[in-house]
Each structure stands twice: as structure tokens, then as C-alpha cells.
Amino acid sequence: MSAGCTQLVWGGRLHWGASHLLSCLLALCALWVLAAAEPTEGGSANVQGVGEAALYQGRGQHRVPSEDNVAVLSDQWEPSSFQPSSAFSGTDLGTMVADSYRGPGNSDRRSNKELPILLWWSENLFPHFPGDAERIDCPLSSCMVTKNKSVKLHKRTKSIIFYGTDFRAYEAPLPRLPHQTWALFHEESPMNNYVLSHLPGIRLFNYTATFSRESDYPLTLQWLPTIGYLHNPALSMAEKNRWRKNGYAPVLYMQSHCDVPSDRDRYVKELMKHLEIDSYGQCMKNREHPNKRLEDTSTATTEDPEFMAFTARYKFHLAMENAICADYMTEKLWRPMHLGAIPIYRGSPSVRDWMPNNHSIIMIDDFASPKELAEFIMTLDSDDEQYLKYLEYKKPGGTTNTFLLSSMEKREWGVNDMTAPNYLNGFECFVCDKENSRIKAEKTYKKSQQGGAAPEPHIADFNHMGCPMPTPGFGSAQEIPESDSWKQMWLQDYWQSFDQGEALTAMIQRNETNQDRFWDYMHETYIKRSMNH
Ligand SMILES: *[C@@H]1O[C@H](CO)[C@@H](O)[C@H](O)[C@H]1NC(C)=O
Ligand SMILES: *[C@@H]1O[C@H](CO)[C@@H](O)[C@H](O)[C@H]1NC(C)=O
Ligand SMILES: *[C@@H]1O[C@H](CO)[C@@H](O)[C@H](O)[C@H]1NC(C)=O
Ligand SMILES: *[C@@H]1O[C@H](CO)[C@@H](O)[C@H](O)[C@H]1NC(C)=O
């Protein structure tokens, strides 16, 4: 690879002419095909034959990172538009091109058959194409990566990478080998797998990439492509007021995923008693979408221009995440800010840490009741000057949060940015470098005849996810009847997940090799828990 291309891929901040970019892309693709064709030996997987179709089909299941966005405006696809799911899209050049991460610190000259192997347990996510094995050159060192599970017991297989949403305690690879670490990639909602929100579940992993800033490789700002995204101009006040006069409510709600742990509809239902809200999605729907084409895609993630123009007319957007957890923030928050609507937000309790300034969103939980919130919104609706104070972050110099600014500056991956690697390849390299330095440390320790200090284990902590038990969107759990579907579904799911983490931990501790015994362990865990109560 030419130095110029390496810089392009790694540096990401340089400005290059389009033709240079293109030739680098072509060169990289060619190199990549060569690398894939190079034979690998010694037990590492070198398996072709998984068809392109299968690869894309698999990835297709992961196309929609924010589970609420059920519909996709595929016919209006705009390649330039922001899709944080770029990591999953095999057709995205960004994924293909920027998957080499070799940094100036990497002087690794080992051949493929000497390199440690990282196994992607969730093969749908394997961020390489074509083939199912690949050499990766990372900032500090190199590894082989594969999705072929036949290497799972190999002594060179040093780490297994799991996708949180697909991780099933009853399908985990057993026995767990002492020389292997487990790595977790989970950028999606905590509701997709509550096992990871409990200590016994998260501690199964050594390295994590989650939405939490506390994880080893944080993906917290995955839905914010750039700071400039926030500075997109809002519709004028006059125009917004005109839409109000034309019969638009001050507040927009657009959600089609209704039975979620945050139980948001229970709150919205109360709020609607005191405040005009236009609801177009399947949840609490009270209006027909004026545009037939957008009707069944009203919760789309894409930045379809018509969809965006329509939603920008509203002064306020109800921005409620499907689950409540520190640092879990999605497009529900960032998109209204991009459009210049004020988010009325409930989701990450620590959301303020990431806001462009101290006066840019309205937090639902700052208000004692839906009625008080409604009164506040109505005041702002009739006071343009007070309203506009919430958009000052869009003015030059208006984005003052240095934590936000520096976090964006420091992040090494890009969102739909062809010049920066995506976070799947980034995390893979993070694990590769960690494993190589662990191998080195273990060798040094052995040579020292146990003289020095043994390398410390690295184990994920509760706060790498740590999402709290779901609570009702409005009122208290005691007031809600046992027959309520939210109560039946999410409280059970949450606590059953705790038991799953404990059961798997017990299986690992006892060197269990038979996955089928998982439910016996679950039963045992359940009995133990009932006895302790
Ligand atoms: C995985 O690799 C082994 C050995 O290299 C090979 O025999 C097998 O067919 C591969 N499996 C898949 C699913 O490609
Ligand atoms: C927000 O206000 C607090 C104190 O009121 C201050 O410490 C903090 O720096 C402010 N943050 C921003 C982004 O202005
Ligand atoms: C990985 O985590 C497990 C606990 O799940 C721990 O027993 C092991 O020592 C850790 N391995 C390393 C290399 O840190
Ligand atoms: C599990 O295996 C490890 C080493 O392979 C051994 O040290 C440990 O005692 C075993 N544990 C049980 C409960 O058999």
C-alpha cells in the first residue's frame, strides 16, 4: 500500500483531491483482493465459498441499528445521506476501503500463519469481504480474523468477538479456554439483550465496545456524524409559526415500535391530555401523514429529504429512547437538533454531558408531571424569543461544550466517512493490539521465570453497560396491574437475563462442555435465587 493511501486511510483529516482518493480506493481494493487470495496455513481458516448473497443477507438483518426504525425508505436512498449503520452495509465503500488500520507503530513482519487469530462468533457482522478470513494490519500489530468457527479451539485463536444483540448464553462457545478472551460489540439498544446489563453477564467479556463512555472502545456518539451536523440551519420562526397557524401541533411524535422497556407511550398518553401532539407513527397515532409515500415509513432512520423537510416544520419533537440507560442516545435526539426542532427528551440520564451547550434540549424528567411539562411547552410555543434561545448552539461559537468537541475530535472512526475506518474494523484492531500486547507480556513473564508481575486480567465492568431495571413511563409499578403487557414482558425479561448470566458463569466455572445443559443451570440458578429471597 502506498504511503499516501495509508495516510488517507489512517489519518482521515487530510484533504485529498477526488482523483487521488479514487486511485487510492482502487489500489486498496486490488490489494485487498490479493490479500484474500494469499493462502494461509497452519489451522487458520482460509475458506472461500460463502457467497456474497449470504453475506449481504446476513448483514441485512443488522441494517437497522435503532430498532424503532422499522421501515426503510430504500427507494429514496441517498448515498450521501447519513446512515450510522454504515458499518453493516457491505456495499458501502467506506467499509471496504478503510478496513486497514495499519499505523506507523506497526512493524509486525510475521507471516499470516504466525499471527494470533480473532474469531467473529457473530458471522453476520464479519467486516471483511470477500472470503471468511483476512489479515488485518492495525495501529500497533497484526492479526488474522475469521468467521469460520472451526478455529474455535485453536491455540492461536486468542479472542472471540461477539455481537451483543446476537449473543445467546445458551449458544456460547464452551468450554471457555483460558487462553482466549471474549470481546463484546454492542452499539444497539440495551433492550436487545439485557444479559449484558447485569454484572454476571458483562463480566463474561474482557473487552467491550458499547454506547457507554465507560466501555473500552466507546461508541457513544455513533449517531452524530460531525459537529457540523448540529449546525444545519433551522426553519425560520416565521415559517414554523405559519405551519402552526395551518393546523400543525407544536409537538411531533413519530414512533412505530410501541412495546418497549422505556414504556414511553404511557407518558405520551398523559401528555396528550394537556398538550397538542401530532402523532403519525403506529404508537398513539392521531393523524394521517399528508404524504402517502412517507406514510408507512414515518419512523424511518434515513434522512430522506422530504421526510426531513416535513419533520423540520415542528417546533418540538418528542424524543424518547426505547430504553433508559446512561449514554444511550440515538437519532431520536440528534436528528431534531440537526433540523432545528427542540427535542423533548427522555433516554440517557446523563445526556446533558454531550449537549452542545447548557440550553439546547428539554428534559422530560425535569418536570414533576406531564401537565407541568405541557404548560412549559405552551409558554415557549408563544414566545419566539425564549424558543430561539434553545437554538443558539447553531450560531458561530455557540457550541461551547468542550467535552463534546474533544470527544468528536478524538474519535478515530467515522460515520459515513470514507476517509476514516468504521467502528467495527476499529474495534477489531483494538482487540488485535490488546491481544498482541498480552501475548508479549505473557512471554516476558514466562522468561522471567515468574520473577516479574504476572499480566493483570482485563475484565469488563458493570458500567460498560449497566442499564437499570425498566420502570413505567408514567406512574409507579405498583399502580400497574399484573396483566399489563409491559409489566409482563420487560420486568421478566430483565430478571431472567440476570439468571442467564449467572447460569453461563457457573457453566464456565465448572468447565461445562455441553451447551445443552444450559437450562439445567438456569433452573439451578432460579432455585438458588428463590431460596435467597
Ligand atoms: C471452515 O474451515 C474449515 C477448515 O479450514 C473448512 O473445512 C470448512 O469448510 C470451513 N467452514 C465454512 C463454513 O466455510
Ligand atoms: C453548564 O453549566 C454548568 C454550571 O451551571 C457549567 O459548569 C458547565 O460548564 C456548562 N456547560 C456548558 C456546555 O456550557
Ligand atoms: C477474561 O475474563 C475472564 C472473566 O470472564 C477472566 O477469568 C480472564 O482472566 C480474563 N482474561 C484476560 C486475559 O484478561
Ligand atoms: C476447570 O479446568 C481448569 C483447568 O483446565 C482447572 O484448573 C479447574 O480446576 C477446573 N475446574 C473444575 C470445577 O473442574
Curated annotation (Swiss-Prot):
One annotated Gene Ontology cellular component of this protein: endoplasmic reticulum
Gene3D superfamilies, sorted: Glycosyl transferase family 10, C-terminal domain
Subcellular localization: Endoplasmic reticulum membrane
Cytoplasmic side stretches: 1-20
Lipid bilayer topology: Single-pass type II membrane protein
Gene Ontology terms: biological process: positive regulation of protein secretion
InterPro entries cross-referenced by the UniProt entry: Alpha-1_3-FUT_met, Glyco_tran_10_C, Glyco_tran_10_N, Glyco_trans_10, GT10-like_C_sf
Pfam families assigned: Glyco_tran_10_N, Glyco_transf_10
EC number: 2.4.1.221
GO MF, one example: peptide-O-fucosyltransferase activity
Annotated glycan sites: 148, 206, 358, 511
Superkingdom of origin: Eukaryota
Lumenal side of membrane: 38-533
Disulfide bond entries: 429-432
Chief localisation class: endoplasmic reticulum
Pathway, per record: Protein modification; protein glycosylation
Annotated transmembrane regions: 21-37
Family, as annotated: Belongs to the glycosyltransferase 10 family.
The protein's role, per its UniProt record: Protein O-fucosyltransferase that specifically catalyzes O-fucosylation of serine or threonine residues in EMI domains of target proteins. Attaches fucose through an O-glycosidic linkage. O-fucosylation of EMI domain-containing proteins may be required for facilitating protein folding and secretion.
Name listed for the protein in its UniProt record: GDP-fucose protein O-fucosyltransferase 4
Organism: Xenopus tropicalis (Western clawed frog)
Gene (name only): fut11
